[in-house]
């Protein structure tokens, strides 16, 4: 072995051995417990970032530790390869999205391999490959058969210049991101999946998951089970009697209704605008701008009076109808009751348009005022009805029951459970995605593609130009024959939401070569024992994947109903930011590698200059690594300079996996220095370590016993920390071990070999290359087999036994020293040793002991 640690040589050698042995190819094995651990598959954006490195290293550490403990472990990898960024890159570079995507996959796969990850590459998938998305199409057709998939009109963002549909994130301040045109809302036919059919199960099954409470709460809120009342305001129009339906969780405030607001797309709005140009103008304005709920929540609330009134269902009084830009047709009934006295949004709206405000609840000790909104106005916990006729004096629950009963008696409505969750619209008017397997025939209508004709293959040679969907212009793709009648027909040009692709990939990993969507191997591996990914996926991806899994179960494809037993949301990687600001307020951000920072005597940054010109830059603070702040660190540069093991060690040591990690160049150097110490000790002591000298534990001297006691004591803690995923303290334990071994004076070769072997196995899951090579070079592999499958070291409990123990010595309750006594010393012997100790003589002021308190194994307190 080399005297000096050369990471590039060490890592190349280890990876060569792993490739030759096909070390990470995994098969099902009923004789072992299985552990299936998955990192959320990456989007092939071009390069890995440090967040990827952290995520995959956590997964890899888990894999290696459990494999050493006898588990049949699996760590696969794939690519979430469809999506809008590929189309954007294609437009920018004039190349098909497919080429951009596959080139990125090749580069990023090479980066992963250089990290030494224990990935079974025989299971690799890319969601843009026909052999994968065929099953998206197949399951979509099954859902269509079962009524889970259906078609209806939906509202989208339409760019009138580019003639294309925009995603919510492509609408910036109401304008298209490319054209700058004012965005319109359009109603177009789209396919939806009935996720609401599973709402109760999605909510209730959260209780059985080992997921972070924060994620569970986010999903609960998104599903949004609400108990309220659905009712209607009666009206007559064009000779017909109808109800303007609304849903409310605050039926106790119904007597405070002073207006109703409806969405611009509501049928009543359309009818009322027929002969009122001012209403048409406002409706057109509402149709410009994003359709995202978040956009609606933050934009200025506007409205226009229709001049039409409905009747209050309980009093018969007229209630004016307004069209409001904050009411979404896609949520609830597309209409809301306005109670400005007790709803903050309605209060602001009423103040803006000078609408009546009526107080109908009060709270003890509070004074109601129309001047400004107060939080208690909307508090149902302290609410008591007032100015509400027969409901006066009732509290929230009583009032809701009474109002619901009266509405029901009048035929206007009743109690109802509703959900914030909406059916999943999966149609996307984009090119780079899974084609929806539908054919449009002039005679037969919408016809599903026959199963034997799947997959409908997406052409990979098209280059989008931003003006509509390229599929609609591709005659080769578009034109086909109707499967029913044989007439000329057109293919559906919409593609599926890319969340479809990521909703079941972890099941396909288990049977990547199956001629069916999944097979028996899937039930062996699934559900995932551990899923790892960022908190940003807490709602959409994780909720959709849970729904998709339940659909697969109900179709008889799998036996499980949840995709992942446990979830780890790793913390973000942070780094310093630096910038300069010009006269217009525009900031230019500089990478930390291009900046020199000065620190005060406590190590805090106090100033910085740009290396190229020596002029000052502003310290922007520590933020998440991102392209926008230019504060990322290229993992490849780190690996090239220090090696993959150093990158892995730093990311595991710097913080617990679930917490944020602050980047530190000094920390990276420290990790590298530690690995050099591990290697140097092995090289300097290779003769003793490779000698395979045995020893009689009972005959060992005190130095050997002390070293073994320390190593096995630390091993016990490290094992516990591995089990609870606290890898930062595992690394701390390894550092303690090295210090103990390196500092042991007079340790015999046999004990040195034993304890260093424990250190290598403890470190191996975190830094597999250097430990694998040391294990082999020092002869451990000849004795125990390659480190890949070496058994996890067992704690030698006998080594932890001590002839003497140390007790804290107190005089009058204050610590005054330490007392060494025989482990099995009697109480009398301990008391005698305590009063004979120099510390007692020094701190008792010559007074005799009145009382001696002995806490076995811990302390002695002498009271004088």
Swiss-Prot record:
Location(s), subcellular: Cytoplasm
Gene Ontology cellular-component annotations: cytosol
Gene (UniProt): leuS
Protein name: Leucine--tRNA ligase
UniProt keyword list: Aminoacyl-tRNA synthetase, ATP-binding, Cytoplasm, Ligase, Nucleotide-binding, Protein biosynthesis
One BP term from GO: leucyl-tRNA aminoacylation
Intervals of motif 'KMSKS' region: 624-628
Enzyme Commission (EC) number: 6.1.1.4
Residues that coordinate or bind ATP: 627
Cystine connections: none
